[in-house]
From Swiss-Prot:
Stored CDD domains: EGF_CA
UniProt-recorded name of the protein: Micronemal protein 6
Secretion signal span: 1-23
Annotated S-S bridges: 40-53, 45-62, 64-79, 100-113, 105-122, 124-140, 148-162, 153-173, 175-191
Ranges of biased composition (kind: Basic and acidic residues): 210-247, 276-285
Described function: Escorter protein required for import of MIC1 and MIC4 adhesins into the microneme.
Coiled-coil region: none
Organism: Toxoplasma gondii
PTM characteristics: Subject to proteolytic processing involving both the N-terminus and the C-terminus. The first EGF-like domain (EGF-like domain 1) is removed by proteolytic cleavage by ASP3 and is not present in the mature protein. Released as soluble 35 kDa protein after proteolytic processing at the C-terminus.
GO MF annotation list: calcium ion binding
Amino acid sequence: MRLFRCCAAAVVAAESLLWLKNGSPFFAFLPGNGEIADNCSGNPCGGTAAGTCINTPSGYDCRCEPGYVLGVENDQVTCMMPSGVPMANFVQLSETPAACSSNPCGPEAAGTCKETNSGYICRCNQGYRISLDGTGNVTCIVRQESGCEENGCGPPDAVQSCRRLTGTAGRLCVCKENFIATIDASAHITCKRVPPHYRKPPFEFGKGGHPVDSEPSKRQREDEGESREPESDSTEPGRDQERRTPLEESQEPEGSTPDSQQSRGGSGSDSTESEEQGKEREEGSGHAGAIAGGVIGGLLLLSAAGAGVAYMRKSGSGGGEEIEYERGIEAAEASEVEVLVDLDSKTWD
């Protein structure tokens, strides 16, 4: 029996030397009672990182991974580095931390991290999006909702583009032709079809319709004033002469011409006013009431002064002076002065 064991050990040693020399698979034949034992327990081949252990009827077989060779350590066949360092020890020394160990994608609520051969990838949860952190690594950050993802600007047939404003939760809506941006009570902007009472202006800064102005703008009024011909003086000749009071006629020297006739005589040569005078008259129309009031006050003051002069002439009759009256006018009428003002006349300009 002892002789048999010695012969078996010699055969194993010889086959080991032949395998190391030729690189052929190694099989160990060990004595036993015929039962198949788990010869791979304890990872005799150095672990799954170094090689794979396969049970055989006579022992185990080591299939080493690339970069490792079969060797003998502590009288046991195993997979080891060519330099003689065991695979298990080498893996322990060269092992690096996993890419997802530092949670580069953020907390669990933000997303999950999955390791790859070249690094990791982040799968962000709802409400988060992919972004780069301060070190240039990919991570998941909170998504700033702008509403563009859910047709926040309106239906697709009404919206030309929807863009999220950087750094805010707002959005920029650009409506298509025949649509206009509207805002509701919640300050939400949407594109809706242009109502019938809307139209496009002569010039536009973008797409969509605009409301029609109920009143012409100042620019339009100026343009209409330039294109319209100036109106001629519609005052009838001799109208001021008919409105003059007897007292005013009595105080005028003979042969003099009324100021109104002189002014009309000077303006009669020009049938139309210049464009600048037309603008000034249009701009000054708002002050016509104030000017008319001032003129009326001035006329009342003049009438009071005329009445005072007439009174002084009357009172001077006691001194032997005669009161002069206008021919054809009674004394009672001369003491009462009536002032007539034509507010519709344009002579006050």
